[in-house]
Amino acid sequence: MALLQFGGTLAPKLGEKPQLLPRSPALTRVIYADPRFLVSKSGSGGRLKHLVSPTASLQSRTSSRLFNHAPSPRFRHRRSSRFIVRADADFYSTLGVSRNASKSEIKSAYRKLARSYHPDVNKDPGAEQKFKDISNAYEVLSDDEKRSIYDKYGEAGLKGAGMGTGDYSNPFDLFESLFEGFGGMGGMGGRAARNRPMQGDDEAYNLVLNFKEAVFGVEKEIEITRLEGCNTCDGTGAKPGTKPTTCKTCGGQGQVVSSTRTPLGIFQQVSTCNTCGGTGEFSTPCNTCGGDGRVRKTKRISLKVPAGVDSGSRLRVRSEGNAGRRGGPPGDLYVFIDVLSDPVLKRDGTNILYTCKVSYIDAILGTTVKVPTVDGMVDLKIPSGTQPGTTLVMSKKGVPLLGKSNARGDQLVRVQVEIPKRLSSDERKLIEELANLNKAQTANSRR
């Protein structure tokens, strides 16, 4: 590694000549590329504090302001007017370990964080970037040579020595290589995991029942449309007679890494390969299913609806949903119940409500009336002296308890006493006689 002399300072040459922004004969600042680092020297007695990559120019208004104005709170003041801008990334902080941590401690910290932030487990928007940062940090700190250079010169020193982070074409490679032999991660990452059989999606069906069907249950034949395995390709999605090849877009990884250069450095984003859909393989698609391995078909199935369901009830029929991919198990069928209302009977949980109208004469003298129930017409005795609004209970005439057909609710009958607005002369005469009799009885009771 060549050394360049600038005044009283020797600076290693990391690929290109450092840029000089002299402000005065007594103050010379050596600037290297990574915008996160500024290397400064004041006077002839100063010494080089950090090495960084020479890829960015500070010949701009932004850079000029750095030297012509007071430093921001991010700058740490030193003697002899020296200042240092620290890098935002710290591999030790990323893994949550101290700078003197052992390799086993670093490995343990990485495994714990990688499990938490792996995109297959953590769906937060920033989890994928966090996972990449963790992988980069572990890649450096787990290698003795890289760690030594990083401790001395930072990340830029690794770049200058041709040992930058990102040696793995995909951060998932590092993750998989570390967890290989530990029983896997339950389907997290990796082409093998992404090629595993996948369970099919659930299918939904809306079923409308009348009032009595919901109360007592019914057996219905329904017609559903769902995805079933393609018979032409046996569910592989590949054209018969052809063999899958490694995807050229992702190199068989199932994921691609896109890099974007910004003023703050190079940002990388990992995404599923659009060419192979994350499988890492490319096949000539089947002419029947278009490469999906499944086709949509219609099927009639017999459904037994239990007694006691209500609007909003959901029935689950196992393995009657959409077929899985690559030979995976099918999903389930969920049947959502909607119950039509009855014009006479109302439902309240497992109880049935009914309003019975009786004349004031029947309410006074008592009577027997026929009342509609889910079991048919039933005689109900109205006791004499029944008051308006009285509720009579017809035991076990309600809705069966869902899952326990031998247990039923009640039918609650609310008595509505009808008082006539008009009376005949004979009716009025009789009621007046009754009123006079009532007055006489009241007067006698007060004596």
From Swiss-Prot:
Q: Which residues are the transit peptide here?
A: 1-86
What induces or represses this gene? Induced by UV and hydrogen peroxide. Down-regulated during sucrose starvation. Transiently down-regulated by heat shock.
Q: What is the lineage of its organism?
A: Eukaryota, Viridiplantae, Streptophyta, Embryophyta, Tracheophyta
One GO molecular-function entry: zinc ion binding
Q: What is this protein called?
A: Chaperone protein dnaJ A7A, chloroplastic
- What species is given as this protein's source? Oryza sativa subsp. japonica (Rice)
Identify the residues that the record assigns to the J domain, covering every copy: 90-154
State its location(s). Plastid, Chloroplast
- One GO term (biological process): protein refolding
